[in-house]
Design a protein with these regions (language model features):
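Jelly-roll (double-stranded beta-helix
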Residues: 1-304
């Protein structure tokens, strides 16, 4: 077995999006080849309604899929296909923009004014860029939860993990997307397929991710880290990008640690990206925006 060393550790950056929503961007809108097939991860977390209530009014997408995971509050959604709904705490929304969709996402806080969720963008391969758009909502009760002997808790959103399969299926990037909670002081090794790009995003507590590629470098609980490279310490709003290997090891801190662990098979295709539209060439991108101006952007009619 080969432990994935940490390739990069960065803090999510404050960003304004939509009509003035304050959020933190873990990665996106730059060179995202190390994250391929993923393009962007936003952490929208706030307890001040004035910082998020303006939301994300009607806007287009083409060429991507989005996975929205809500932990507190709700996100009211509507789109050009006629879909309407609300993503509540613990729920997932998966949207395939495909050939084109126009939608809005309007966050609402819980009774204490808190709003928290994540949105992950996954690229579509060139063969599926112009597929019909589609949409799915998954309720919290449908998401399998695994609790290990040491108290580690895993919610399986997408893909197969520890024998459980998440309810969000059919995403072209074939992601494995899990929400991991490790109790204080515990060390955990988690499998990740070698062929996948993988990252973790810490949003509660803190921990140390093993930064060695040799199995002998795995620490022994209560003894310390034996690797020559020090472990990467990650706390709230830290993104950890991993290098090659087939497993990762994390030591939870005194308050435990909770993080998203996401992996996917790289597409290795050219990316032409501007705002909410992601294609393969600049000409395709130009055409998409021209169609927006001409009113011919939507290729699929709304359901009656």
């Amino acid at each position: 077995m080969s432990i994935r060393p940490v390739k990069r550790l960065v803090k999510a950056k404050p960003t304004l999006e939509g009509a003035g929503v304050h959020l933190r961007r873990a990665f996106g809108f730059g060179n995202t080849s190390d994250f391929d097939p993923f393009l962007l991860l936003d952490d929208f977390r706030n307890d001040q309604p004035r910082d998020y209530l303006a939301g994300f009014p009607w806007h287009p997408h083409r060429g991507i899929e989005t996975i929205t995971y809500v932990l507190a509050g709700t996100v009211e959604h509507g789109d050009s296909m006629g879909n309407r709904g609300a993503i509540a705490a613990g729920d997932i929304q998966w949207m395939t923009a495909g050939s084109g969709i126009i939608h809005q996402e309007m966050p609402k806080g819980d009774p204490d004014g808190r709003m928290h969720g994540f949105q992950l963008w996954a690229n579509l391969p060139s063969s599926l860029k112009m597929m019909p758009p589609r949409y799915q909502e998954v309720k919290a009760v449908e998401i399998p939860v695994i609790t290990d002997d040491d108290g580690t808790r895993v919610r399986v959103v997408c893909g197969n993990f520890w024998g459980k399969t998440g309810p969000v299926e059919g995403i072209a990037a074939d992601p494995i997307y899990i929400d991991v909670s490790i109790p204080p002081g515990k060390r955990k090794t988690l499998p990740v397929e070698t062929t996948r790009h993988a990252f973790a995003y810490v949003f509660e507590g803190a921990g140390k991710f093993c930064n060695a590629s040799e199995p002998l470098a795995v620490p022994t609980e209560g003894v310390g880290w034996a690797d020559t490279a020090p472990p990467a310490e990650a706390d709230n709003r830290s993104l950890v990008l991993f290098d090659r290997g087939d497993e990762l090891t994390v030591q939870a801190g005194d308050a435990g640690i909770r993080f998203l662990l996401v992996s996917g098979k790289p597409l290795q295709e050219p990316v032409a990206w501007y705002g909410p539209i992601v294609m393969n060439t600049q000409e395709q991108l130009r055409q998409a925006f021209q169609e927006l101006e001409q009113g011919t952007f939507l290729k699929s009619e709304a359901r009656g």
